[in-house]
């Protein structure tokens, strides 16, 4: 797709075999892409070919298949580096998912740099993957775990920062770029600047950002960034931690075993160089290759086109949903929202809503979305969440809205 060309979601749907089926006799309206994305043939077929022609273990042998597999893995690493605009490919660490990436930072950096008198700052909006590891490691290390409150749009209360800086030694600030629950797109510049003024590291959960918009880690200014392949048309089982090279060099390993060593003796083991120090055991080889294919696919379409398409869908959805009787919408307006819309129907449990929608072929998520502190803030146990991606078409949103009117009739 050429630069500036509008995304054609109808044409792109032909790349996704899953849309060839019906669910309960209805066209599949897959509105759960914030949970996980569907996979195009370019990724599925490419991974199959890799398994059939090039699969072997990597960095461990000199035979032809090993060389092919290693080339595939390291080629994918370079694609990730370019995708993130990271300065050095050695800063790209392959992990299972964003959750593991964030745990790696919490344990390997936090476990060696946090102590009594220090503080970790997060927000009420965080996915548990960027909340629970910091909560745990702070408690284990005797550090304080502090939380910025958010407003109804999901924006953190920056007026708390002066008091926090006055009363605490902040070592970590951790938050998301895009909320997985409200869809809020954040301007992180004030928080990044403040964190660095405190001498703290800034950890960014970009799992919901990387699939939907251009992500430049150097412009972002974060010290660590986590993404997940399965949310961006890639396979499950592959994620990425990007970190500043000087910080990664100074950190101890997270997992120990094969591949991550330099030498092993009875009295001492030394670690390998970056990125291998953090990639113990057999790598997710085909999964990394698949992530590289997914990046090719997204960049061919254009991240700007994907972002614009999702803004249009969000505006369309918010306009229709606002007219549904008894609905409560959460989060900001369409201009500051990624392709995520969370809502509740008055008097109807979200799980009941989701089950009835499934009868109409509509797939959404119902639950706390791994954001229980946010649910507590909103005063609810759960919400419904519809989420969009590059293959979403307006008719699927129509199908959702029609389904919600049907839900209202069932519970009338």
Give the ranges of each region predicted by the language model:
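Pyridoxal 5′-phosphate
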Residues: 1-412
